């Protein structure tokens, strides 16, 4: 067996005394063992992040730009290695894994460009009597050491969405990766080490939850950026004290399909949005509301599209639905489906488990209080519900503790803007599924879906602080 995978602190790889297994979620076989940090390791990582922050804030933007471009290039050069690792570690279908690597390359490339254009502002202060000679200049400065806690489902790009803007803004960052997928984050550490940044600019430290909570409460971190479940995110926020917090949490994304929509297109997009990567994304399509006049037609087309999606071995390029991340996830989803059926829901397709893979499952006759409707499924299950009036669909979609993204398929611009005004979400996507995300757009939600925004430019704003300079400009003598 290969040596246990070390973690990265202060530009050096360290072995820990405690090892944890990382298993292939499709085969269940051991993939690798990873060293996890002790309290002493955590203290070293925190201090390394603090020390690096002092150096990082002095780096000129051109140096940050070139370092981020090197990271993007390193990712691209090793793209096949990263993709294979994500397929083995996260069970991510090969085509999705390749797509994620390309997105991560773009995330670092975008961050490199944004490093050159962190904005400032000249503010006239002569609006009130007595301030005639005053001028203000506002610039954004690095916030300081950042703590990033990342999920399993995008083990590269969601790490990139914390690391890239942190470095672009002139900060250092400590990443605590998901216990199911630490290998991808550690491989990214190899690439970052070659970019010429100060030691400790990026530290990567797998650890247990108890130690992670100690990191969260440590006042030396000035910002926590967390992506994960709502329950954990809000619990951590309560422990953060004075530090700034960005939370990207869960969702149970809804879609509205109107009679004037391109029904074939909507069905095709909803199938991909609901079942890609086995529905293990926070913006996976979970609830579809279809106008009653087209409900039968849409459902027929949707079921045909879903039935074409191949489930199974994620290393097969034709696979769309791979394994769930672990047996607990599989059992939970089976339980929720069974509970919904016992409460009156009907299974239109799927509903069975094949080892670690759940069949694509479509349910009808669901109610808003069923777990499959009101909680985050995070699995390959989609509900289809008819409605009579557009306002009824808006109300139903809002009947959720979450508010991340929503899709509306219609050609009526008035209805699009009505949805934009009234849907309680972070983004409304017209004639597109809520699963869509561009890596430079502001991304985040409301209600239990989080606070703050990701997307490189938005994240840089969170990872910097405004600083004001006031000039009292008196006229030179003799003028």
Provide a role label for each language-model segment.
Residues 123-265, 387:
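Rossmann-like NAD(P) dinucleotide-binding subdomain of oxidoreductase/dehydrogenase enzymes
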Residues 109-124, 307-311, 347-352:
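Proline-centered turn/helix-capping motifs that create local helix->coil transitions or kinks
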Residues 1-25, 463:
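Hydrophobic face of amphipathic alpha-helices that form TPR/SEL1-like repeat modules
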Residues 231-367, 430, 476-479:
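ALDH superfamily catalytic-core signature
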Residues 28, 64, 86, 108, ...:
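Residue-level signal for inorganic ion chemistry
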Residues 31-119:
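Glycine-rich loop-to-alpha-helix module at the N-terminal edge of alpha/beta enzyme cores
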Residues 30-37, 52-58, 147-148, 255-258, ...:
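Short, well-ordered beta-strand elements within core beta-sheets of diverse protein domains
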Residues 27-33, 197, 256, 310, ...:
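Conserved C-terminal structural/oligomerization subdomain of aldehyde/semialdehyde dehydrogenase
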């Amino acid at each position: 067996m290969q040596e246990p995978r070390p973690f990265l602190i202060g530009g050096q790889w360290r072995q820990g005394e405690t090892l944890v297994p990382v298993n292939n979620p499709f085969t269940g076989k051991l993939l690798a063992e990873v060293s996890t940090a002790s309290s002493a390791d955590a203290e070293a990582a925190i201090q390394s992040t603090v020390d690096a922050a002092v150096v990082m804030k002095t780096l000129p933007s051109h140096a940050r730009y070139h370092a981020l471009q090197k990271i993007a290039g390193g990712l691209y050069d090793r793209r096949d290695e990263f993709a294979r690792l994500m397929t083995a570690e996260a069970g991510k279908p090969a085509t999705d894994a390749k797509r994620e690597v390309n997105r991560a390359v773009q995330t670092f490339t975008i961050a490199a460009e944004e490093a050159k254009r962190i904005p400032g502002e000249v503010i006239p202060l002569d609006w009130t009597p007595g301030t005639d000679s005053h001028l203000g200049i506002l610039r954004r400065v690095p916030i300081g050491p950042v703590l990033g806690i990342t999920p399993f489902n995008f083990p590269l790009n969601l790490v990139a969405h914390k690391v890239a803007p942190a470095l672009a803004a002139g900060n250092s960052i400590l990443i605590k990766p998901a216990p199911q997928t630490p290998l991808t984050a550690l491989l990214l550490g190899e690439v970052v080490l070659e970019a010429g940044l100060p030691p400790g600019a990026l530290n990567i430290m797998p650890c247990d939850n108890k130690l992670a909570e100690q990191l969260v409460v440590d006042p030396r971190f000035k910002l926590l950026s967390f992506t994960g479940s709502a329950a954990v995110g809000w619990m951590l926020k309560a422990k953060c004290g004075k530090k700034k917090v960005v939370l990207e949490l869960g969702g149970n994304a809804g879609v509205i399909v109107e009679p004037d929509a391109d029904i074939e297109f909507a069905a095709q997009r909803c199938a991909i949005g609901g079942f890609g990567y086995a529905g293990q994304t926070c913006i996976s399509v979970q609830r579809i509301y279809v106008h009653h006049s087209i409900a039968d037609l849409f459902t027929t087309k949707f079921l045909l599209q879903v039935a074409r999606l191949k489930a199974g071995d994620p290393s097969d390029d034709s696979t769309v639905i791979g394994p769930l991340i672990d047996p607990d996830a599989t059992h939970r989803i089976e339980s929720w489906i069974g509970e919904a059926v016992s409460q009156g829901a009907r299974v239109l397709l799927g509903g069975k488990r094949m080892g670690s893979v759940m069949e694509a499952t479509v349910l009808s006759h669901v109610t808003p209080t069923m777990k499959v409707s009101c909680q985050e499924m995070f699995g390959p299950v989609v509900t289809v519900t008819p409605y009579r009036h557009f306002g009824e669909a808006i109300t139903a979609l809002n009947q959720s503790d979450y508010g991340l993204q929503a899709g509306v398929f219609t050609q009526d611009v008035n209805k699009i803007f009505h949805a934009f005004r009234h849907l309680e979400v972070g983004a409304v996507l017209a004639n597109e599924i809520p699963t869509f995300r561009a890596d430079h757009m502001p991304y985040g939600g409301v209600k239990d879906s989080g606070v703050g925004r990701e997307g490189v430019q938005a994240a840089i704003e969170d990872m910097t602080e405004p600083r004001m300079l006031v000039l009292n400009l008196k006229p030179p003598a003799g003028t």
